[in-house]
Swiss-Prot record:
This is Nuclear export protein. GO terms for biological process: exit of virus from host cell nucleus through nuclear pore. The keyword Protein transport does not apply. Gene3D superfamilies: 1.10.287.230, S15/NS1, RNA-binding. Belongs to the influenza viruses NEP family. The keyword Transport applies. Disulfide bonds: none annotated.
Length: 121
């Protein structure tokens, strides 16, 4: 995994956890949790690609991995929409920068997961 991506995830998660968005802090915590889950999933897919022999163990361990992959893409799309919405409504420059970087990272991760999945298919 790219070390820049790891630090980007960590940086964005740290900054998002410091944000106070009033009544929507519960939503923000949900976004943070999904970001972390997405990072772990992307990492595990990347590791499986690196050990191409793991394709069979990945498939046998999780017979529904294509369904899981589809679910992750849905989560990414939801997060992208949520981040775009937050970006539109916030006037705080710190939050704007954080959400712009989160959006960029989500788009990069979506592309990485897509690339990994094509290699595994």
């Amino acid at each position: 995994m790219d070390s820049n991506t790891v630090s980007s995830f960590q940086d964005i998660l740290m900054r998002m956890s410091k944000m106070q968005l009033g009544s929507s802090s519960e939503d923000l915590n949900g976004m943070i949790t999904q970001f972390e889950s997405l990072r772990l999933y992307r990492d595990s897919l990347g590791e499986a690609v690196m050990r191409m022999g793991d394709l069979h163990s990945l498939q046998s361990r999780n017979g529904k991995w294509r369904e899981q992959l589809s679910q992750k893409f849905e989560e990414i799309r939801w997060l992208i929409e949520e981040v775009r919405h937050r970006l539109k409504i916030t006037e705080n420059s710190f939050e704007q920068i954080t959400f712009m970087q989160a959006l960029q990272l989500l788009l990069e991760v979506e592309q990485e997961i897509r690339t990994f999945s094509f290699q595994l298919i």
